[in-house]
């Protein structure tokens, strides 16, 4: 889109760059950090990156303080990683994030923040729906290996679903991201298969970040459970966006960034953490009324594709790149019409690359990914 205006180069290790090469860089773009630590090294490395006048922009899609239930919490605590990431946020010339909620936290450390929502690019084939059909209504969970507490929200509802014999052979539950030998997904499987008792369960293999969305072609309804805690409230609405682009219905936890996108009962379903029975009731209603699922999916797709225009958001991002490189402040930039979101209307310290070629497997079939 901007090939005539800029040249983008992917650098595997900046330490291998010569001074001559460093002089050619106007702007460094980093996801969360430019160095993993220690904290004492963050500023010296930033100074090296800037020594010939280059600027630094961070992309931030997750909060840097993890809850005690997060699978990375121990690692973050032992390595002081939350402080390391916060130091990066403070020192960056500008920060890009995805929602007003996370922006408000970043503003406490860095005033140069702008919002560029997650939006799929159709040049990536995985975002072009190639739906499959089934006589059963198919539910799917697409989450990385850091959601043990979130998946636990489904344990009782899915157990009740399994025990409802009026629904037998009328639905499927797919766990996407299955990775043979991964203990987290083995735990997830215990929930989705009701400890092996649900015959309506199957797997979708793990895939990398460039193909995992293809797994949506084998489901009809996405499940997006999240605990209502600060870390999760500062995540993006990515799971809603994925479902919308793939023209799927969604049942999601009633967490702020999801609630900004979904009108409960119209273009999706929102479930309060204190109402776990609603997961079961909503899934049963969808199994009994598949036409409702199709209507919800179409409404969600129309809404989200209207809200998230790739050209507008990409232009906003590129204008930010140009103006930071030219040393125009974010305050000045925001005075220029950019299509910036005006209110809370808009993944993860999560490894989105832990899924595979998107082909469903039987419950007992191994994955070779």
Tell where the protein language model's regions lie, with residue ranges.
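Conserved catalytic-core segment of nucleotide-activated headgroup transferases in glycan assembly
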Residues: 1, 121-126, 132-214
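Nucleotide-sugar-dependent
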Residues: 149, 199, 203-242, 252-260
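A charged, aromatic-enriched C-terminal amphipathic alpha-helix characteristic of glycosyltransferases
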Residues: 274, 290-326
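Donor nucleotide-sugar binding/catalytic pocket of nucleotide-sugar-dependent glycosyltransferases
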Residues: 90-127
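C-terminal alpha-helical cap of glycosyltransferases
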Residues: 310-347, 367
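Membrane-proximal helix-turn-helix segments that form the acceptor-binding/catalytic region
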Residues: 75-94
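Conserved acidic donor-binding segment of nucleotide-sugar-dependent glycosyltransferases
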Residues: 264-265, 269-276, 285-290
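Active-site proximal beta-strand in glycosyltransferases
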Residues: 28, 49-66
């Amino acid at each position: 889109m901007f090939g005539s205006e800029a040249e983008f180069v992917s650098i595997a290790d900046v330490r291998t760059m010569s001074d001559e090469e460093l002089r050619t860089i106007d702007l460094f773009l980093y996801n969360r950090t430019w160095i993993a630590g220690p904290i004492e090294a963050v500023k010296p490395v930033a100074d090296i990156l800037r020594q010939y006048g280059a600027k630094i922009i961070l992309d931030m899609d997750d909060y840097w303080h993890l809850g005690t239930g997060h699978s990375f919490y121990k690692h973050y605590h032992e390595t002081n990683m939350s402080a390391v990431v916060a130091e990066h946020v403070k020192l960056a010339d500008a920060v890009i994030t995805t929602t007003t909620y996370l922006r408000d936290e970043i503003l406490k450390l860095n005033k140069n923040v702008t919002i560029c929502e997650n939006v799929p690019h159709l040049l990536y084939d995985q975002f072009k729906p190639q739906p499959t059909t089934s006589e059963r209504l198919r539910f799917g969970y697409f989450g990385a290996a850091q959601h043990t507490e979130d998946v636990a929200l489904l344990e009782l509802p899915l157990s009740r679903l399994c025990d409802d014999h009026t629904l037998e052979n009328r639905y499927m539950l797919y766990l996407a991201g299955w990775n043979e030998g991964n203990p987290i997904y083995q735990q997830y499987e215990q929930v989705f298969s009701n400890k092996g008792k649900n015959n309506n369960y199957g797997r979708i293999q793990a895939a990398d970040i460039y193909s995992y969305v293809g797994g949506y072609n084998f489901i009809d309804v996405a499940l997006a459970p999240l605990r209502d805690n600060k870390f999760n409230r500062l995540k993006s609405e990515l799971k809603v966006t994925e479902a919308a682009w793939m023209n799927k219905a969604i049942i999601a936890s009633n967490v702020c960034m999801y609630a900004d996108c979904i009108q409960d009962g119209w273009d999706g379903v929102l479930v309060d953490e204190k109402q776990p029975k609603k997961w079961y009731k909503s899934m049963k209603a969808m199994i009994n009324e598949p036409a409702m699922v199709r209507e919800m999916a179409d409404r969600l797709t129309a809404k989200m594709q209207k809200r998230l225009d790739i050209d507008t958001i990409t232009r906003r991002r590129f204008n930010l790149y140009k103006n930071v490189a030219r040393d125009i402040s974010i305050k000045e930039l925001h005075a220029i019409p950019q299509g910036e979101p005006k209110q809370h209307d808009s993944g993860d310290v999560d490894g989105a690359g832990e899924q595979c070629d998107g082909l469903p497997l039987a419950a007992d079939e191994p994955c070779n990914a």
